[in-house]
Amino acid sequence: MQAPTSRTTDPATAAADSAAGVSATAGSVGPPPRLPSGPTGLGTSSLRLAPPAVETGESGPPQPSSPSSSPSSSSSSQRIEGLYSPPPVRDDRALADEINGRLVEWAEQDDVDLYPDVDLREALVGFDPGRSVVLCHPDAPGVEHLMAAARLLVGENAVDDYFCEAEYGGSADRRGAVLALAQSAIDPAHNTPRYEADWRSGLDSHPALRSMRSAMGHFRALATPAQAHRYRHDIASLYLGYNAEGDCIHQHRTPAVWEYLVQRQFNSFRPCLTITDAIGGYELPAALFAEPGVQRAVALSSNASTICNDLYSLRKEQRSERFHYSLPTVIAAEDDCSIEDAFQKSIEVHNDIVRLFEEQAAELSATHPLVARFMTGLSNWIGGNHEWHAGHVGKRYATSP
């Protein structure tokens, strides 16, 4: 996603900007679990429960169960052959377009001012976050729930673009400091009035920080305090993963495969997956969420979803001139094999992780109905995420190295 353009900071807040240190230059054991009665969100009334995960490839995309729920983009999607994934449950182009339109309106608000440039607004719509949340959260009870997920998604990408991508001013050696400030946009600092005012001015000075602050406010309006706290914790873990990646990039060091997979457990889509209950209009109680088995299922589903991104984005990353690593490249380095062979080995790793998730989810789903519903949400996210990536093949993604 292309980074937003920073708004000019008023001279009166320049000192606060300096204190904040933020500027535009900163840097298979049966089917997966299902909801007992199927999805209940917008556009899902005629949908059947999703079949088990399938290996996608020459067989093409799964057939929609309702003409009203399948946009034209689904039939033209291209998928990585042999990649094992649950199929998407709900794909609604009109609903995705509505979400995208509302996102542009939100991003243009004075307290966000994320994408003031026309080209960047078009890039936001081209990124298609609306379709992502429609695919990944088929049980969302309304548009505002989908918007809550979409705002967080856009804010997370703005933080990644600004603070982690060199082409947008990110710097590996300053990443930790700016990410701590980004965390404070959703996990407020508590200081004396004087320094709290400086902190607020610091947040106001940067579009990524403004967007995360606003997105979190909307999310808190529909989430419970425990769900909001869970999101803050998962974002902090994500930033820990960003820092691990930044350290390797700073050293130009390719980690071992096992180390990379450890990094991926933190530097993953986990914050997007673990809000599945809040976006679905219910709550998995904190005590159940903290159960080791649930945590394992969350980690596996998050890793699988992020490795899916590794695979689809490999060609784009290889074309860039910067030092970068992903599962295929670390396997190629460790096994001394071609990138094509490493790509196939990465598919196998992804598929094994999805199957491990399915096994864990099936076991957990028998323990509590809310756990079963949460496991279904994770499964929906894996399938929706894969479909969204496949929909961008030929534009930002590819099905081979």
Locate the predicted segments by residue.
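Alpha-helical, largely C-terminal catalytic domains
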Residues: 1-401
